Amino acid sequence: MRLPRNLITLGLGLTLLNAGLATAAEELPAPIRMVQEKGARILGSFDAPDGLRGYAAEYQNQGMALYLTPDGKHVLTGHLFDAQGKDLSREPLERLVYAPLAKEMWQKMEQSAWIADGRADAPRVVYLFSDPNCPYCTMFWEQARPWVDAGKVQLRHIMVGIIREDSEAKSAALLASKDPQKALHDHEQAGKASTLKPLAKIPAAVRKQLAGNMELMESMGAAATPAIFYLNAEGRMQQQQGAPQPDQLAEILGPR
């Protein structure tokens, strides 16, 4: 899954819980219930032209606009455009689906087992799912040095183990270290010369952290490392798969 760019705004609209409760208070028409029974979450309703009634749904982390016909017997799915080409589905989906979904995902990343890289009071936070054996994670670590060293950005490495057989044990070694931040810094700075050793026996608490990180990564549709999540200038959450190109760094990390 790749969250649609420029549609996900933090802080707008209701939370998923509140939106769900608001919709639950309504008596859903049969065609809308049919869509719900197929696995979609109905998160809210909205006004639509010409007697249509709009419903915002979420299915597998994607927004879906539903339009109930005036007779209440049929439902249309997809985007609705006016004569000027304006997408009338965009604002309701952003407000009722993508904004609260992004907020929920950001909160889950905040609560995950991450290792800080940079000052705690940095004005900008960037999350990335990181594997100790990932050369592109090291590349992004190096790319970000000017921003991190200047105190402008804090990277938060959500550790996972997916690349090699010893990746999980190496992530465990970092998380279980007496100083995870220094251990990660030393590992990334050394690059191929890193002396990081996989943990021979992963403590149950650390294994639980890694399992939670992996579950979160999968739920967010990330399939490779680094999977980078950040807020753009408008406060909208964006996703970057893999090490970014040089001309993308300012978008992800802010002004240098």
UniProtKB/Swiss-Prot annotation:
Keywords: Disulfide bond, Periplasm, Redox-active center, Signal. SUPFAM superfamilies: DsbC/DsbG N-terminal domain-like (SSF54423), Thioredoxin-like (SSF52833). Homodimer. It comes from the Bacteria. GO terms for cellular component: periplasmic space. Disulfide bonds join C134-C137. This is Thiol:disulfide interchange protein DsbG. Belongs to the thioredoxin family. DsbC subfamily. NCBIfam families: PRK11657.1 (NF008657). Residues 1-24 form the signal peptide. Involved in disulfide bond formation. Functions probably as a disulfide isomerase with a narrower substrate specificity than DsbC. DsbG is maintained in a reduced state by DsbD. It holds the Pfam family Thioredoxin_2.
